[in-house]
Curated annotation (Swiss-Prot):
GO terms for molecular function: magnesium ion binding; thiamine-phosphate diphosphorylase activity. This is Thiamine-phosphate synthase. Its EC number is 2.5.1.3. One of its GO terms (biological process) is thiamine diphosphate biosynthetic process. 4-amino-2-methyl-5-(diphosphooxymethyl)pyrimidine binds at residues 39-43, 71, 110, 139. It holds the Pfam family TMP-TENI. It comes from Hydrogenobaculum sp. (strain Y04AAS1). 2-[(2R,5Z)-2-carboxy-4-methylthiazol-5(2H)-ylidene]ethyl phosphate binds at residues 136-138, 166, 186-187.
Amino acid sequence: MFKDFNFSIYLVTDDAFFVDRDVVRTIEQAIEGGITAVQYRFKNKPSRKMYEELLVLRDITKQNKVALIVNDRVDLAIAVKADGVHVGQEDLPPDVCKKIIPEDMIVGYSVNNLEQLKDAMTMPIDYIGFGSVFHTKTKKDYKYVGLEALCKATNITSIPIIAIGGITHYNLKDVLKCKVKGVAVVSAILGFEDVKRAASDFKQMYKESLSMQI
């Protein structure tokens, strides 16, 4: 169940940030810095390599009580006993995923606008990744929806929403005002050489932003 996990700082991996980096060590450093969940997302990597990396990451994430979500690859998620799978508009439908995965695994679903959100509200999903909220280099083909749409999204559904797309230290406070359950980040952490420090700084900013809203 989604409530069993903390998705407040949800790291999403991207091929572009791992050209000269070790995947496992980099994610481990981000965990040491304070991320609470990680989505393993690679589009240009052999399945065997992904499986081997995920096996190691499964142990690390379990030890640190960090949720491990696998993007798109339901087979790999099942094979390594991940906490869940995340699918998009062109991937395997959520209802099909639910029929395949164990009952204790969750399904996340990407939604790019309010119309798609309305459709998603009828699906068997555990959380929604909504965005891109802002312009982002990692999703160049996505139109950004803005804060107004994000706030509307959290108001019209009880399904937990994770904000995604272009979220940085500079706009985090405004994003959290929309009452999201967490933020998905890529470059805000992976865009720095010292990933542990970047994650730690982002975590501190997250805490400060939340405290200002109380």
